[in-house]
């Protein structure tokens, strides 16, 4: 699957107060049986880990969410009904990975059967090159924290955009790892679901 979807530019100037988004942020596990608009998908992916500072000859790029030592080890995969994509934050595009619907597999709860969009946070341990990451425990804790920053950004965007979202910790990581065709250096951290709320 080599399909590439160029996303529309993110709307980075939406007039929603940050403190209000923090106050109103909620986990919502029910959503409409409806597609998520591509503009919302563009916005929430940029919120997760979009580029805010371009790389130079001397420095790496910067993302919307921090990562330890700016390792940028977390990638966001996007599960849609038509297939699995990887978010390329440099090009702000979706890169096709699999022609298969993995939405039912990104969580163990029955609600996943109707999920419109699933985000899968994957850590590439090969990018954790700083000597401080000298064992798998440290690599895992760092990856979990860095993915959490990204998922919280998605939460705040969803609050502002009146979308429903929930992070899923009950994940068959080994099964999902195999279905996605990941390498031994890549680890599924957790997943997140986004959709239109039933009460909107």
Residue ranges and their predicted role:
Residues 175-188:
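Short, electropositive alpha-helical surface patch
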